[in-house]
UniProtKB/Swiss-Prot annotation:
Cofactor(s) needed for function: Mg(2+)
Keyword terms: Hydrolase, Magnesium, Metal-binding
Active site: 8 (nucleophile)
Pfam families: Hydrolase
Name of the protein described by the UniProt record: D-ribitol-5-phosphate phosphatase
E.C. number: 3.1.3.-, 3.1.3.104
Molecular functions (GO terms): 5-amino-6-(5-phosphoribitylamino)uracil phosphatase activity; metal ion binding; ribitol-5-phosphatase activity
Length: 206
């Protein structure tokens, strides 16, 4: 029986628009943004930021070096937010409803620029931060690992005391779903942009 649900952030709770993000970073001056940005797993300084190896300010400085000019923290943040489309309140309300019957967690490859927005009242039109929708957030840059590394899953399992066989892992990334299955989680892989609420309800009721 499912007792816990672990959601991914980008591509599940909030839809991702990689092309918009690429254009935002090109506008900053990063001419090769298209080769540096990935929907599922970053590389270079982008990966180092998500793994917590670079602080937000260190990333800003190194990105500025690549762009050939000094960038502000706000400019850098807005470029990162280019990844995300408008937050769908229907999904957020659905997740709130799930919390009446399940423990709800977030496991995300992310960074402090994105989370400074997501964990603020600006996140939703109702003025609620992401924290209000989950029991706990497990964020790659705070934990020093990114999915699909087993270490980030292991930390979440030990910290939350979830039993994988009693936990549904919801993620749009194939490699993340693969490791989730290997670790014993029940899994569900919706497509980025999909309204997965009805399908998830069927899974939980089966």
């Amino acid at each position: 029986m499912i007792k816990n649900i672990v959601f991914d952030f980008g591509g599940v709770i909030v839809d991702i628009d990689r092309d918009k993000a690429v254009q935002a970073f090109i506008k900053l001056g990063l001419a090769d943004a298209d080769t540096r940005l990935d929907k599922y797993h970053q590389t270079g300084i982008f990966q180092e930021l998500e793994e917590g190896k670079l602080s937000a300010d260190e990333f800003r400085k190194q990105l500025g070096d690549l762009c050939g000019r000094e960038l502000t923290m706000e400019e850098t943040k807005q470029a990162w937010l280019g990844f995300f489309n408008e937050v769908d309140l229907r999904k957020l309300d659905y997740i709130l409803g799930l919390r009446k019957s399940y423990h709800v967690y977030l496991l995300s490859n992310t960074n402090p620029f994105v989370m400074s927005w997501a964990c603020s009242p600006e996140f939703s039109s109702e003025g609620k931060p992401l924290n209000d929708y989950c029991d706990k957030l497990y964020l790659s840059y705070q934990l020093g690992h990114t999915k699909p590394a087993p270490e980030i899953f292991d930390f979440m399992i030990k910290d939350s005391h979830v039993i994988p066989s009693e936990t549904l892992f919801v993620d749009d990334g194939s490699s993340n779903i693969h490791i989730g299955k290997e670790l014993g989680f029940e899994t569900f892989q919706p497509e980025n942009g999909a309204d997965w609420r009805q399908e998830l309800t069927v899974i939980l009721n089966s």
